[in-house]
């Protein structure tokens, strides 16, 4: 996929609808082993936040492509002692072929990408989580054999997942509804970006009513109510977010064929009930597996694997 060769992925707004559709097609081909690609490259993982799925899926994807992975824990690099990001970036780009960064501030990611000559991938920031949404869209496509015209409802905190889901859904022609408590809405600039991409052809709706949002939806999606770095707010958030739990009652308002997604880790009994996450409409485990296939497609595209 030559269009993404050598490019960064800092946000889903960085790619076109066509490029996103081609990535999903490549992920499907790689997953089914219709296509096997190889690249003799080195991926660096610079993660300031805890990670299970992102770390393991990127590592396995790179190994399966024939490449190598170096885990650059900031605590054992000079970053932890205050080395400027621009200095670290200009050193690492002389050793590595590509870098995936998981950090708090989107601005830090953008600084790294500005100074590094190698491609940089957003492996999660407080603002966006584009790689997760690649896997989400792949899972939805597998479930319905299409994306255009479907409706995804996200309930909970207007966090990085809500931001990236708005962009991803707009790019593939899906309607997206975001239901949050008052004061916990997604980033207003990203809302406007998503609406510009949708161009009045699909819906980008913000509401405080989870039942209204869920009604007739084909996908219900949630995430933790307190993200990494917000642990001290968890107890205060609990009563505020309780009406936004994906329960059997909320799921009953969705379309009969609706599926349920969660980016994990899940706090069962909080944002999602045990019955729903373990129920027949849950696609959470397929979604987690698809992190591997979606990110393998992304790496192969950026690195020009053949």
UniProtKB/Swiss-Prot annotation:
Residues that coordinate or bind carbamoyl phosphate: 51-54, 78, 102, 129-132, 263-264, 291
Enzyme Commission code: 2.1.3.3
Gene Ontology terms, MF aspect: amino acid binding; ornithine carbamoyltransferase activity
Catalyzed chemical reaction(s): carbamoyl phosphate + L-ornithine = L-citrulline + phosphate + H(+)
Pathway info: Amino-acid biosynthesis; L-arginine biosynthesis; L-arginine from L-ornithine and carbamoyl phosphate: step 1/3
Biological processes annotated in GO: arginine biosynthetic process via ornithine; citrulline biosynthetic process; L-arginine biosynthetic process
Domain of life: Bacteria
Key word Cytoplasm present: yes
Compartment(s) where it occurs, according to its Swiss-Prot or TrEMBL record: Cytoplasm
Keywords linked to the UniProt accession: Amino-acid biosynthesis, Arginine biosynthesis, Cytoplasm, Transferase
Keyword Ribonucleoprotein: no
PROSITE patterns in the cross-refs: CARBAMOYLTRANSFERASE
Chief localization: cytoplasm
Residues that, per the record, bind L-ornithine: 160, 223, 227-228
InterPro entries the UniProt entry points to: Asp/Orn_carbamoyltranf_P-bd (IPR006132), Asp/Orn_carbamoylTrfase (IPR006130), Asp/Orn_carbamoylTrfase_sf (IPR036901), Asp_carbamoyltransf_Asp/Orn-bd (IPR006131), Orn/put_carbamltrans (IPR002292), OTCase_ArgI (IPR024904)
GO terms for cellular component: cytoplasm
Pfam family, one: OTCace
Protein purpose: Reversibly catalyzes the transfer of the carbamoyl group from carbamoyl phosphate (CP) to the N(epsilon) atom of ornithine (ORN) to produce L-citrulline.
HAMAP family from the UniProt entry: OTCase
Family: Belongs to the aspartate/ornithine carbamoyltransferase superfamily. OTCase family.
Name of this protein: Ornithine carbamoyltransferase
């Amino acid at each position: 996929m030559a269009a993404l060769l050598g490019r960064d992925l800092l946000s889903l707004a960085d790619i076109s609808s066509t490029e996103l559709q081609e990535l999903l097609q490549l992920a499907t081909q790689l997953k089914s082993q219709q296509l096997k690609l190889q690249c003799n490259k080195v991926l660096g993982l610079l993660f300031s936040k805890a990670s299970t799925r992102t770390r393991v899926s990127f590592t396995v994807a790179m190994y399966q492509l024939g490449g190598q992975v170096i885990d650059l824990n900031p605590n054992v690099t000079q970053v932890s002692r205050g080395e400027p990001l621009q200095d670290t970036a200009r050193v690492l780009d002389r050793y590595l072929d590509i870098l995936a960064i998981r950090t708090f501030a989107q601005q830090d990611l953008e600084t790294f990408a500005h100074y590094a000559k190698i491609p940089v991938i957003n492996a999660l920031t407080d603002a966006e989580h584009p790689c997760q949404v690649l896997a989400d869209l792949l899972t939805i496509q597998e479930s319905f054999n299409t994306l255009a015209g479907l409706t995804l409802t996200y309930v909970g905190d207007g966090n990085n997942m809500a931001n990236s889901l708005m962009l991803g859904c707009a790019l593939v022609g899906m309607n997206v509804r975001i239901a949050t408590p008052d004061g916990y809405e997604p980033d207003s600039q990203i809302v406007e970006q998503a609406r510009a991409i949708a161009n009045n052809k699909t819906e980008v709706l913000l509401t405080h009513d989870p039942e209204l949002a869920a009604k007739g939806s084909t996908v219900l999606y949630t995430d933790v109510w307190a993200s990494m770095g917000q642990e001290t707010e968890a107890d205060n958030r609990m009563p505020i977010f309780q009406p936004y739990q994906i329960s059997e009652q909320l799921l009953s308002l969705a379309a009969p064929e609706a599926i349920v997604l969660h980016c994990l880790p899940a706090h069962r009994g909080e944002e999602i009930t045990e019955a729903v996450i373990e129920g027949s409409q849950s696609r959470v485990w397929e979604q987690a597996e698809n992190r591997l296939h979606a990110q393998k497609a992304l790496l192969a595209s950026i690195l020009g694997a053949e």
